[in-house]
Amino acid sequence: MKDYSHLHIGVLALQGAVSEHLRQIEQLGANASAIKTVSELTALDGLVLPGGESTTIGRLMRQYGFIEAIQDVAKQGKGIFGTCAGMILLAKQLENDPTVHLGLMDICVQRNAFGRQVDSFQTALEIEGFATTFPAVFIRAPHIAQVNHEKVQCLATFQGHVVLAKQQNLLACAFHPELTTDLRVMQHFLEMC
């Protein structure tokens, strides 16, 4: 396995699947920190925006001054990886919702696109560049409804909808790779940092 010990990756720890992301980062050999204050962002090589409740995370990001600080992290070219709610936070537009959180990625996201909590599922997903399928866990998952194909690279689709996409230093994922033992999506992110 490649050496990632030189990387310091933070996971925004306002709400959501923080410990699961930290575990995967550490399993890959990188340094991992739960980020609770804006000042902790400066030492990072990359940041994960975890799944959780996007409205709650967005409100807390505004309350604690994270919006502009994370936008600055992105402008510096540092990697940002949004999973599920994190994808919603990264989007420049939400379908049928005027709310914009970070507005960094040229995508329009539909929230809860695959149904409610009771409709959660796991599927074998083909991801560009992966030799075998990935065990993707979808929980109240969004999908990308519209994408600027000139700026955004679509890495995976499910039922005709984009569920994993990359734009320069940004990675957006509709499913929860942190809830599996498969480290390849997180490793892909570390390669971006």
Curated annotation (Swiss-Prot):
The active site is at C84, H176, E178. Its EC number is 4.3.3.6, 3.5.1.2. It catalyses: aldehydo-D-ribose 5-phosphate + D-glyceraldehyde 3-phosphate + L-glutamine = pyridoxal 5'-phosphate + L-glutamate + phosphate + 3 H2O + H(+); L-glutamine + H2O = L-glutamate + NH4(+). One of its GO terms (cellular component) is cytosol. L-glutamine binds at G52, E53, S54, R111, I139, R140. Catalyzes the hydrolysis of glutamine to glutamate and ammonia as part of the biosynthesis of pyridoxal 5'-phosphate. The resulting ammonia molecule is channeled to the active site of PdxS. This is Pyridoxal 5'-phosphate synthase subunit PdxT. Pathway: Cofactor biosynthesis; pyridoxal 5'-phosphate biosynthesis. It holds the Pfam family SNO. Keywords: Glutamine amidotransferase, Hydrolase, Lyase, Pyridoxal phosphate. In the presence of PdxS, forms a dodecamer of heterodimers. Only shows activity in the heterodimer. PROSITE patterns: PDXT_SNO_1 (PS01236), PDXT_SNO_2 (PS51130). It comes from Pasteurella multocida (strain Pm70). CDD domains: GATase1_PB. One of its GO terms (biological process) is glutamine catabolic process. GO terms for molecular function: glutaminase activity; pyridoxal 5'-phosphate synthase (glutamine hydrolysing) activity. Belongs to the glutaminase PdxT/SNO family.
